[in-house]
Amino acid sequence: MADAKDFLFEIGTEEMPSAPLNNAVKQLGTMIAKGLDEAGLAHGEVRVISSPRRLAALVADVATATDEVHEIKRGPAANIAFDADGNATKAAQGFARKCGVAAEGLVRREDTDGREYVFAEKNIPSAPATPILTALCEKTIAGLQWPNYRSQRWGHEHATFVRPVRWICCLLGEDVVPVSFADVTSGNTTRGHRVLGPGDHVVASPAVYEQVLEDAGVLSAERRREAILAGIAEVEADRPGCHVDTPKKVFEEVINLCEWPTVLVGTFDEEFLKVPHEIICESMLTNQRYFPIYDGEGKLTREFVVVSNSKPENAERVIDGNERVVRARLDDAKFFYEEDLKISLDEFRERLAKVAFQEKLGSVLAKSERIEQLALAIAREAHLGAHLAADAGRAAHLCKADLVSNAVVEFTSQQGVMGGYYATAMGENDEVAHAIRDHYRPRFAGDELPEGTAGCIVACADKLDTIAGIFAIGEPPTGSSDPYALRRAAIGIINILRDRLPIDPTSLIDFALELYSEQGIEFDAAEVAQQVRDFFHGRLVSMARDEKVPADTVAAVSAVHIIAPSVFFARCAALDEARKNDAETFDNLATAYARAAHISKPELGVEYDRSLMGEAELALADASEAAQTAVDAALVAEDYPAAFAALAALRAPIDRFFDEVMVMDKDEQLRDNRLKLLNRFEAVFSGIANIGELARKK
């Protein structure tokens, strides 16, 4: 067994962007561990340390050499490897070549299965770790991927990296491992903070690496996170009731923007609090990575948190500089908002004629007109009052107007939000303003639904218009490709219709496509409508499975092609509960239903002749008629537990029927009459669920 030493591989660069750095951190540890394993170098824990200017792997207890190995590989069967004369066949020669041995050296022996095979055996001598580590590090640094970021060529070679590589520190114990990349060769030095610890710093061994960094003004990502969180906690403790808003994406980016974080608090002028807080906060978060501070009532305060890449003694100068920067940014936001208030939303809306929605689907103005008509149709379908329908129509009329406003052009994520402010400013009522503000919701999984009913209507209309249009031009989602986010839009509609607007979207899909036809878009309306219905149905099934509804329950309900979300999920819940309460009945009923479906002939219809029936047949006929009446009444009342209880009552008569009646009688008249009765039995289920899809427990 070889000795073991700690190993360090550090790539030093110019400041790397946060997102690719995080991605590289995930890659580096995996690549190093995999490379060591494949090379046969024993090792301990692999840790990755990063900062804006470095990416490093620290590996504990790396063997200084590989172990000597006696390698045995099994090849083809002996009768395939050698011909009748004992000569090696092509199969044996290929196997030997692959294993790096001569065909004559292959060994024949019986394996555990009793058959004779050929085996290649060879001794692989121990190899020193240093050359292996050199090759691994050079392969790793060249193999790091930078998705969504263009790698650039540095030095005189063809090597590329996301930022210029300035130094490489690579050590196995106290010994330098030679590594070269882009005209840079490895050594035993690292570099510290540009201001707090400039220049080269000797790393005597991997064990002292983190301490050397800290002494040079560089903390690891974990330490930086802890320091920032502690600083923010102190800020909040000094301001009882206040809360520092730290969105995850921005927070992670800030961690990767500094090497020695210091949490400071700055302020901006009171006048900026008159501007909608959403654009103030977005300006601070996205442009400067400042964290807003809210008071105990959730209102934005004049203070903000800035994370400085320096020590506290520089605080006054750093705060002053950041306050000057934030004032310039907020001046811009205030200017955009005040200029927008000089123009009505109706005037903004007319400008949408020059904004394309989609190349083949016309302008955003045309889209807003379709949304308005769809919103009114949804209000009618939901049987809402005239006042609420009018609010939904007005909100739909104006919902896209803010897209051409100054504030939204600058802060695109605030589309809808700014429209809500502008609607209030021009005298629209709260329902209209809130609907405009909320109509993009839900924007992602777990997002809130629109606050008001009008907002739910406009949100559904907007999303359904997009889905219908993209399907009409033949560009639906395929596999993992969904460039128009139609799956997300469909899930948004389903969540709204499930929780807030219990309506069936079938007729609305047809109407949405009709509006495109009136616009001159050519497509097969019936075919596309079916595609859209199938698309919604697929999302319903997927969501039910994600919610852990049993797969066979989902299959039973989805088999009757319901796309009204509230109905679909209510039926799934009722069937699942019925099965839990009386599993035996539904298992047996499922078996009987499947048997009936297997032999039935739908073309015979359901009109049977009672005069040809015996007692068991009459019992099933009476039970089917009674169950049909009960199911129909339950469906009208949306009492799905009652509907499934009515189906459960069919178990005894169908079991008796199959026990006592020969369905496929030689007498054609009797046979057909019994098949018609089974058709009638099946028809009872057709409007609620296909019980035959249920799993049978034996």
Residue ranges: model-predicted function:
Residues M1-K698:
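Amphipathic alpha-helical "coupling" segments that flank catalytic cores
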